[in-house]
């Protein structure tokens, strides 16, 4: 007998207690973004594949579920990342001059999970700034990312900084790199120096030595001084290191690490990259950086920087308890009781009316008060 209730692997229902916390944190974060002047957008869950993947890397294509549109016969994709959609909205639909701040919150779907226990249906929350090429935008986005994590009750946060321009400068002028690109990035991300030695055989010695050094350039801000002494003294690398120093000095409320081989999303990013970690966990809880090239694919090159996080992961880590205070009301045909319940709900109170024959309360609510009949009518009293 088949189990009709089974869900696909790495897909799960969100039950009331988890859903309540997720919704509370979603509201907190969107309200926070609003105080910074970010406008909410809601891109569609489904787009034609060429639009959905425009300006993105090969890894997003692999994470995107595809299907055929029954109306047009064209291939469509279920979004695996909202950020490219928001870039399309800024470049093609809004088409505003100057700075635009946008934020979003919505489900995405992954063809494969990012990790063994990872969900294939994250709830992605993020914010983006378009139209400012200076480091000030990156500082604001990094500050907002920290504030969002703190709004979720997370503490002891560490920020890891990297820069896509360093690797780009090292690989510039190496036309054969495309053949080994994926293996190179995998070795750098895992800091597998032995694999790097094998992959970089035959490269010019200067570039090879620099690539082998990247996994060792990890630690506090002092790593940047070691990087200046170790990496080639090119203008592009010098500018990238200067930007990392400037960004690191602006961080408040988190410790800073430099990790010059943390290159996840390299194909996507064009400048500073950062990831937030909490103590005791190996995986990042939020990630962001600069991606100036994405809008160009939609016909309008725009400086852009932003961050995103998976709200389900953050909610699982959050110590915040969300158990709503409620008022218990008996079941009674008295019109005065009905009027009292309507008035309380209009004022924002949760009123749970007991149905006939049921006396057990739901654990999801803390009914610390009750409606009782007195001479003056129905009044709220402690329970």
From Swiss-Prot:
Cysteines paired by S-S bonds: none
GO cellular component term of the entry, any: cytoplasm
Molecular function via GO: histidine-tRNA ligase activity
Pfam families with a match to the protein in the record: tRNA-synt_His
Role, per record: Required for the first step of histidine biosynthesis. May allow the feedback regulation of ATP phosphoribosyltransferase activity by histidine.
Miscellaneous remark of the record: This function is generally fulfilled by the C-terminal part of HisG, which is missing in some bacteria such as this one.
Subunit structure, interactors included: Heteromultimer composed of HisG and HisZ subunits.
Protein name, as recorded: ATP phosphoribosyltransferase regulatory subunit
Species this protein is from: Cupriavidus pinatubonensis (strain JMP 134 / LMG 1197)
Gene (name only): hisZ
């Amino acid at each position: 007998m088949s189990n009709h209730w089974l869900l696909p692997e790495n897909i799960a229902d969100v039950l009331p207690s988890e859903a309540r916390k997720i919704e509370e944190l979603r509201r907190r974060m969107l309200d926070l973004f609003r105080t910074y002047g970010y406008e909410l957008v809601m891109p569609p869950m489904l787009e034609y594949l060429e639009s959905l993947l425009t300006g993105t890397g090969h890894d997003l294509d692999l994470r995107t579920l595809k299907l055929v549109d029954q109306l047009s016969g064209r291939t469509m994709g279920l979004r695996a990342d909202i950020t490219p959609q928001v870039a399309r909205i800024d470049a093609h639909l809004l088409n505003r001059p100057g700075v635009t701040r946008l934020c979003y919150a919505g489900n995405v779907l992954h063809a494969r999970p990012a990790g063994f226990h990872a969900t294939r249906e994250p709830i992605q929350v993020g914010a983006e700034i378009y139209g400012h090429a200076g480091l000030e935008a990156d500082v604001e986005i990094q500050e907002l990312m920290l504030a969002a994590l703190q709004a979720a009750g997370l503490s002891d946060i560490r920020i890891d900084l990297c820069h896509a321009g360093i690797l780009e400068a090292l690989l510039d002028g190496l036309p054969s790199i495309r053949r080994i690109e994926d293996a190179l990035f995998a070795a750098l991300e895992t800091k597998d120096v032995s694999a790097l030695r094998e992959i970089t055989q035959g490269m010019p010695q200067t570039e090879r030595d620099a690539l082998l050094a990247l996994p060792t350039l990890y630690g506090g801000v002092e790593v940047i001084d070691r990087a200046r002494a170790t990496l080639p003294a090119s203008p592009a690398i010098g500018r990238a290191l200067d930007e990392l120093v400037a960004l690191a000095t602006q961080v408040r409320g988190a410790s800073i690490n430099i990790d010059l081989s943390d290159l996840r999303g390299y194909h996507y990013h064009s400048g500073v990259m950062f990831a937030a970690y909490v103590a005791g966990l190996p995986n990042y809880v939020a990630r962001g950086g600069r991606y100036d090239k994405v809008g160009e694919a939609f016909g309008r090159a725009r400086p852009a920087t932003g961050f995103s996080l998976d709200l389900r992961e953050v909610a699982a880590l959050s110590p915040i308890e969300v158990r709503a205070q409620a008022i218990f009301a008996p079941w009674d045909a008295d019109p005065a009781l009905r009027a009292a319940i309507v008035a309380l709900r209009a004022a924002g109170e949760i009123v749970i009316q007991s149905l006939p024959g049921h006396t057990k309360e739901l654990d999801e609510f803390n009914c610390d008060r009750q409606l009782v009949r007195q001479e003056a009518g129905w009044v709220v009293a402690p329970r």
